[in-house]
Amino acid sequence: MATERYNPRDAEPRWQQKWNEDKVFETDNADPREKYYVLEMFPYPSGRIHMGHVRNYAMGDVVARYKRARGYNVLHPMGWDAFGMPAENAAMERGVHPASWTYQNIASMKAQLKAMGLSLDWSREFATCDVEYYQHQQHLFLDFLEKGLVYRKQSKVNWDPVDNTVLANEQVIDGRGWRSGALVEQRELTQWFFKITDFSQDLLDALDTLDQWPEKVRLMQKNWIGRSEGLTVRWEIVPETAPAGETEITVYTTRPDTLFGASFLAIAADHPLAKDAAAKNVEIEAFCEECRRAGTSLAALETAEKKGLDTGIRVRHPLDPTWELPVYIANFVLMDYGTGAIFGCPSGDQRDLDFARKYGLPVVAVVMPSDGDAASFAVGDTAYDGDGVMINSRFLDGKTTEEAFNIVADRLSAASLGNTPVAERKVNFRLRDWGISRQRYWGCPIPVIHCDACGVVPVPKTDLPVKLPEDVTFDQPGNPLDRHPTWRHVTCPHCGKDARRETDTMDTFVDSSWYFTRFTAPWEAKPTDPEAANRWLPVDQYIGGIEHAILHLLYSRFFTRAMRETGHVAASEPFKGLFTQGMVVHETYSRKAGAGREWVAPADIRIEEIDGKRRALLLATGEEVAIGSIEKMSKSKKNVVDPDDIIASYGADTARFFVLSDSPPERDVIWSEAGVEGAHRFTQRLWRLISEAAGVLSTVAAAPASEGEALAISQAAHKTLKAVQNDYDKLWFNKAVARIYELVNALAAPLTKVAAGEGDIAYRAAVRDAAEILIQLVAPMTPHLAEECWATLGNTGLLARTGWPRFVEALVVENDVVLPVQINGKKRAELTISRDADQNAVTDAVLELDAVKNVLNGQAPKKIIVVPQRIVNIVV
């Protein structure tokens, strides 16, 4: 009888070495079995993994191990999203080269991930900063360029003067750079773009096919793509107010039905008319500059105070040339959406209403709800932006909004301004082409050359890779490639004259937009092996954070389509199933208050509870510190737990089991020492029960019982097996944990009985069968412990190579059935009764139900109709 405690410090490295030696998790592309590709979003090599990583990779590993046991050929690779600004910041702060900083971090994090016992195919590992990876990215860029999916243009960009780089709109917070905090400037730069807008409609339509994605993510992408059907309307400028050479303003609108409610036009600060006005007026120039400095993300625009300035320009209403409207420059109009000009209908749009009230502009209600009263309907502080019936709209009065839309569209399309229709129907998208140029060193070089004679010349594919030079310095801001004495100077591949390399590098989102494809054949001399890519793609289960719901996932969807168009893959969608897991959160602790507040790490405090009141005390001094809110683990608030500490104290299996057990996987998990200790106690209990009975169980073959004392044991095990199998299929890890706890409780007494030498052969065989099922159920979550238990029962093969158990159908059939009971066709109760009960037994049991007695009130029913195993209907 084994009595020693389970020692993860001994067992975990031993089993990891065994898996590694046997190459258990290396995947053969030629394996003919059905494929299953599971992938967690690969990490940025920051230097340390955190508990969020542990949860993410533990989830993926459960799926990989489970599917492997179910007989699939599983691909479960790992790599590193290794380019980006932090490496350059480290180079500037510490004088270390970005490459050495990055590869040191990769080595540290790889050791941490290996200690978790993840079933990863490390033979396919790469970092996106490996030349062997990014040379293929350069190849793809050139293929996209040939296909017309890449172009270069002058573009207004958000420029961070501290980081000396371009920022996406989403990276500008309250007019400042998200990383540096510097006031962002607007600059005109020549940028490289991917033509993601070529696929706008397809990217939108295909969302309907992604039925294994969270609805929330699909909705976020739908809104980001932002398809709208509307009208471009040309407004004639009143000649006396027109700037030289200007005769009209074109507006895009999705609500032409509300034109009679118009009270102003608004243009973006970068609209040509605004620029013209700014050149002549200092006040307008200052206002336009203020608009440019503000955040340009949708969230920033929605929350900012609505401001405008009258340009003095007036336009004629397209449906009534005697009606003139003012033209404002407004801070909520973007040049890169629609035409950079809108008409304001204050009664139908809250933003326009706020603006009109602020500047004393007319507010005319033109749409009311279908059941409204035209005589009394008015707009107060809230605009009415719904559909309904037209009012105060002349020939449109009484029409529905849909009818009015079409009447206006037809009328204005038939009318002319000059020799061109006043309006035309147009489908618009909010989605913009993807600007990939970044003015930094640590990224994939863009493989083009600039020649004064030939213009922009692609680097010949035979000359790839364009490697980053290693001899660079970071002693001043800006891009070291611009300052390099030799790297940028080359000869033109066309004419042989002196030329210059492109010094911009690619947005790091490019690196992560196709890495999942490279994993299918990372040794290939071309970007992909189409046969391997077509076999493995799409990824069956992709797991990562909701923060990547839009950009990374949308860019990956674009890239897969672009790679399809250029012959690299057959798939259109990269990820068949998507799961977005919650974060790992922790209490915060702090000393002092206000500006002098100091955050305290969980490792530096102890919690004591007296009379139901919790207190946090500093370990060093006993000083009480404040317990704050539960928040995402972050270094700034020190509420982090180091996975290395947990693994050293409790073992990897305990850490894995806890992050999977405590809450539904899509929700945040609250880290608690008590929860971790509970998970650790479970691993110890499981080992004790199995190891103490192992001496006896190893002498019998596993066999489920079909009768007698052991039948209940086999039923519990096989019912749990069926249920947990369903839980794993649906990624309900916490439900699986709850069922496993129940099964351990059910098997505790039988295992103890067997350990004491009791029970006949059939009983012991049933207990062994149940114990093996239990071990196989926990194996995806606690693989080291499971291997140890499996081996102690005398099994010789690796559990990691063992197939999934099969439940016996007869053991999982429920003996009871729940029958709805109706009285005169209305459901009044439910009856739980044996499935084998005859009609008389059902009738007798129904009449004993309190709900039935209350309705009958002592009367005998006319008739009782029993549909076996379906329903009971009483006729009164």
Curated annotation (Swiss-Prot):
Catalytic activity as recorded in UniProt: tRNA(Leu) + L-leucine + ATP = L-leucyl-tRNA(Leu) + AMP + diphosphate
Entries under InterPro entries matching the protein: aa-tRNA-synth_I_CS, aa-tRNA-synth_Ia, Leu-tRNA-ligase, Leu_tRNA-synth_edit, M/V/L/I-tRNA-synth_anticd-bd, Methionyl/Leucyl_tRNA_Synth, Rossmann-like_a/b/a_fold, tRNAsynth_Ia_anticodon-bd
PANTHER family for this protein: LEUCINE--TRNA LIGASE, MITOCHONDRIAL, LEUCYL-TRNA SYNTHETASE
Short motif 'HIGH' region, span: 43-53
Annotated family: Belongs to the class-I aminoacyl-tRNA synthetase family.
Binding site for ATP: K635
Pfam families the record matches: Anticodon_1, tRNA-synt_1, tRNA-synt_1_2, tRNA-synt_1g
GO BP annotations, alphabetical order: leucyl-tRNA aminoacylation
HAMAP family: Leu_tRNA_synth_B
Coiled coil: none
Motif ('KMSKS' region): 632-636
Localization: Cytoplasm
Name of the molecule in the record: Leucine--tRNA ligase
Annotated PROSITE patterns: AA_TRNA_LIGASE_I (PS00178)
GO CC field: cytosol
Enzyme class (EC, first level): ligase
A molecular function GO annotation: leucine-tRNA ligase activity
